[in-house]
Every structure is written in structure tokens, then in C-alpha cells.
Amino acid sequence: MKKRMIALMLAGIMVLSVTACGGGGASSKNQNNQDDGESKQVGVEVTEDMQSAPPEDAPVGGQVVVAISPGTLSPDMYGGWSNNATNSGFIGLMSGYALADYNRDYVLDWDPVVVKDHEVIENDDGSKTYRFEINDNLKWSDGSPITAKDYVFSLLLHSSPEFAACEGDATYGWALVGYNDHVQGTTKEFAGVNLLGDYEFSMTISADQLPNYYEMANVAYGPEPLAAIAPGCDVKDDGNGAYLTDGFTEDLIRETLLDPDKGFRYKAPVVCGPYKLKSVDLTTETVELEINEEYLGTYDGTKPHIQTIISKPVADETIRDEFEKGTIDFYSAGTGEKIEAALTKVEEGKLDANYGLVPGTRINEMRYMCDFGPTQFEEVRRAIAYIVDRDEINKQLTGGYGTVVDCYATDATTDFAAIKDDIESELIHYSYDLDKAKQELIDGGWTLNEKGEEYKEGTDKYRYKEVDGELMKLKVEVACCEDDYSKLYNTVIPPEAEKIGMEYKYTSMDFALRINHLNRQGIDEPEYNIFYSSIGIPEILFYWNCFDDDPSLMGSWNVNYISDPELKAIGKEMQKVDPEDIDGFRKLYGKFQLAYNKKLPSLPMGSGVSYMFFNPKLKNFVPRAHVGWGAMVLDAYFEE
């Protein structure tokens, strides 16, 4: 099968950030007392094609301090739950040994560090079995061996009703034979997962999930530590599929996963990535990672050379000052004023930094909740789009270093770049137009006043609509934080909403509370129709999950809670494209983007480029798109 670029990400589809966070930083011992030797190259622009594995003789040591936006660190330190952009950087560095990994061209292939041998078998019933033998030298951070049981356990755990009851993402293996029966608890066996030996196992993709454009991604899972998460339990296979012995219960994993002092969700005591968790303090928002000495490296042999990584909350207003003082190693500037000011200081020799351009891969958006209230109706979503001057807002926020996007992609997205010229003229470019906004509401039935009589502009303040026999007020509730984006939105949008008969009410809250409302965790009923957020657009995305209204996908994959037959149908068509048929996939991809542009599950506000400035002593650090700071740090090393 032709190797394809795959993005094994939820969220984010599922990854959330309110504002662009600063990058990272170094302890003062790394930047202070710098010499003026020839090895210190300052003011150098690095480009993506300069990335590589660190040299074999690169020194190991030093400390990188990652600047995070104050108030954004959540308790989650382990994969399997909704985590934001701040946490995902640390979690990613503690994760490893997936069966497939990306090369530096973002092409997914089997990881030779993990996979010793594999075989693909096409079965008579139309299903397809992937059989793996893993290497026998892999270890967890505690020194215990990683075996086939740990890979099988990962699938059994993350597709179990017990894990779902712990508010975890229980969608692992969703394309495999027997997934539905296992996740619903109908059978203890997972029919499409088989334990074949100490280092051998297999996964079988269901016939109804084939062909599948991202086929390899459906079996590219990593391990979980069976002995640590489910002590006393075992993985068995009697021929009908792998299963966990009777000791595996919800109470057991609640203790091992959710205990606030030692649970995996919060403390990640055993991992297999390049780094392991040394400590975490939510009060000071300090996360400290250290090298996992048991880690064998990525597919190309890349191993960590920075000894420790530590977080430091830094306000956006002071992040460059912190960098200049030598307390942080790198930071991102995302507005024209900040970019140009920093570049000028570098050119004048007043800012000790190297730098690189990072193309925009995130969309700032107004994320609609499409399952309740006025925003469940597409006419309301479009009406809001017509009362917002997106072009002017984007210009003010980025200083000209950004673009307004009209669909679910950015200019850095390869598939979109390939079809942009074909569909751009058909995309609606929503711009300020009160008449169009009002017409959308009229077309959507928002033609009544609070008495149920005909709405009269100039007399009645707010519009209403009869929904399920009752009057629904045209009122949208917005959850936001106290950032520049929110402040500007909340200044310009509410008065325009009043002009079309809409009440637009915003509530500012801290980041953690907003995340709880967004993820609907710890709340009785959803309250907010709109969240100001940003979302990363990976090179490859499971569109068929992101817009599927299956209850198990709502919130984790389908972040808009949208139930739209057209988006769902196109997504399923995209899934069924043969991996070899790139043109066929892109044709459907364009069709999807046009539908998204009309349905507006979210209103894209813009996408901006950023410049990352970093300590010149941090060598082999290459800013680039489609990876987070963690991948850049993993390549890097300090050179005094």
C-alpha cells in the first residue's frame, strides 16, 4: 500500500487554545554568561529543510523552560482525555512506540524501532488483518519490558465501557471487527484484536470500514502498561479475540487512573516516550520532565539531548522581556507589531536570537455548539457571520501577518493548497452585511416577537422562533477568556447583534472552567452556544469521525456536536476512497469544504503565521509547521 501522510490526532481536532502561547525557555545557566566565540551564531534564520536528527556526538544536558500562558495548565498529564494545547505538548513527549511514526516529510511508515516484522492478510469476508511482531528490547520508563500484551491492552482499555465511565476516550479500535460489541460491553472479547505470542499480535479492520483512505492509521496504536494500570489482571485470547481477566473493573482503573496523588491521568508514573514526568505543581503551573533513559529513539534514531524540560507561566505582554533576560529559550510572535519589533532588534544586534517562520496551521474560530439553542440552526450561524467584519478583525489582531479563511483548512494544508484554485470562487466569503444577516434569520423562521406575534423591526427588540411548540428567543451565550481576541470580539459583535434582533451575551471565565464547559465535564447541562477558540488543522484528519453524530463521537471527535446529514455523508465517502486515489479523495475534500462553508459548524475567523525566536545556543532547533514545540526540542541540544 502506498505510504500516506496520516495525522493520528483527536481533537483536534480536539486540541484547544485561546491565544497563541509563547514557546519555551531556558534556565539562566543556558543563556547567561554567553561567550562571543565563533560557535555562537546569532541572527540566523532557519528553515524547515534544515531539520535533522541530532548528531551522534551531540552533548546531553541543559534545561529548557517552556513558557505557557498563565491559567492554561490543566491537571491532565496523560493521553486519553480531552487535553488542551498546553498539556498536549508535555503529554506528547511522554508518549512513544506507536507501531507507525512520521518521517521528516510527514509520511507515515512502520517504525523499525518498534516493528520487527509485519504481514497484511486480505480475508475472504472482505476484512483485512494486520499481523505484527515487535522487537523484544522495548522497555517502560520503570525498566519493565514492553510486550504484545501491552499493545493489546491499550486497545482493550481504550475501547472498554469501564474506561468510558472514567470520562475517557473509548474510541480506540473503532474500525476493527468487534469494536461495537466490546465498547458496549456486550462481549468481553474484542474479536478484531488477537494476542498471538509474547511479542506478536494482530488487528483486523472490518470489511465495512474498507477501503479506507487512512487505512494504516487504523492500526497504528501504541502500548499501555498493563501491569501498572490493571495490576493483577491479564490479557488472554482463547481464539475468539483478546480479553481482560475478571479482575479488570471500573473501580480498579478509577484507582490507578484517577487517584489525584498517583493516578496515570494526573501523574503519568510509567511512560514509554523520550521523557518522563518528574513533577507537576498546578499551583505554580510547573511541569518538569526529564529524559527517559529507557527510550530507544524515534524511527530515525532521534533521542533526547535536553536533560530536563520545565514550564514557566509567562504573560504574552512580557514574553519577549523574559526571553531577553535569558529565562526562556524560545517564544512565538504572532502579530505584525511584535514580529517586526523582534526582527528589527535581531538585525540591530539588540536581541540575541535565531528565528524561523512557522506557517499557520491553526484557525481562530467561533466554535458553535450545534445541538441546542439558536446555534443549532445554520441560518443563525450564518447570520452571526454576516455581522462580523472578519477581515478588519483579523487585520487588527495579526497586523497583516494573517489571512481570513473560509473553510476548514489553512494555506499550510497540503490538500487544500492542491484544490484551492478550483473551489475558492465558490466559497462564501462572509463579510459584514446586516441585510444578509436579517434575511438569513427571516429564512430560518425567526420572525416572531416575545408574544408570538410578527416581529417588527424598530419596535420589537429581539426575535423569536417557534421550536417544538414553544417560543425560542434569539439569544446566544458565549464563553470566553480575558485575551485580546475575546476583548475585541466582545467589543464589536454585541452591538451589531442588537441591530438584527439578537441578544449576544458573553461570560468571561478562567481557562480551566471554560474547558470544562467546552468538554461538558462536571456540568449538568450545556449553557454556552459559542466558544472563542482555536483549532489545529493537521495534514490529515478523520473527517468521517469529526462530523459523525454517533453519540460515542460527540465531544471527543465531533467537537461541534453537529448532526448534519450532508457533512456526515461526504465524510463517509471520503473514508471509502482507496488510499491510492489521491485525486478522488481531493475531489471529495473540495466538496466537503464547500459544504462546511455553507453549514458553518464553526465560523473561521482567521489563520496567522508566526515567527519563533530562540536561544542561539539551542542547536538543531528548527521551527516548522505541523509539529509542536516538543518535536523541535526533541531534535535539539545545547552547545556552550
Residue ranges and their predicted role:
Residues 103-105, 219-301, 308, 435, ...:
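Gly/Pro-rich hinge or "lid" segments in bacterial periplasmic/extracellular proteins
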Residues 66, 143, 323, 328, ...:
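Periplasmic binding protein-like
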Residues 290, 376-494:
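Append "and occasionally in soluble cytosolic enzymes with long acidic Gly/Pro-rich linkers
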Residues 65-123, 270:
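N-terminal lobe/hinge region of extracytoplasmic solute-binding protein
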Residues 387-423, 485-494, 520-640:
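Detector for C-terminal structural segments
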Residues 168-252:
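Surface-exposed binding/hinge segments that line
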Residues 262-266, 294-342, 503-505:
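Ligand-site clamp/hinge motif
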Residues 117-170, 196, 202, 322, ...:
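Aromatic- and charge-enriched surface segment that lines or borders ligand/interaction sites
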